[in-house]
């Protein structure tokens, strides 16, 4: 059974089934470690964060290589109308794990937050068989994954100090703080915008899928 993160009225079950099948086919030939290693995945968090500093056309290849070492077949896939999916995680019959993501909104900061959100689901054991991560619908499982993803990207205590000092009022300070967290400045900007601390403005997008 799949765990849902969406309003089901937006989901076409036939489209969703086709999309899931596409994920399975696109990850079928990816060479991965014999078994899922969640401890190694946790250890690789700093390496995964470093990937955001690479050129956009190199990111998917590098992420695929990192996840492969952890026994996870990773792929960024196109999204379909009728399947408002952010991520799909499935344990295969041979014990491997598939992790697919879409670029529905294409914003770079949302991509990285969603990626770490999916990683949190893996580390939290939310993927016993199959987990479909849609765009909406909340709950304890989702809140926990959101919190963990946010912490992976930006230390919450240091972020609170940064906000309290009003460093967000200067772009140079945003860049400086981002460097202390080993993330791109758009990660900090995205969080500040989401929390309505700064106004919404243009930010980088990806165009892979």
PLM ranges: what are they?
Residues 1-209:
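Active-site hotspot residues in diverse enzymes, especially metal/ion-binding acidic/histidine motifs
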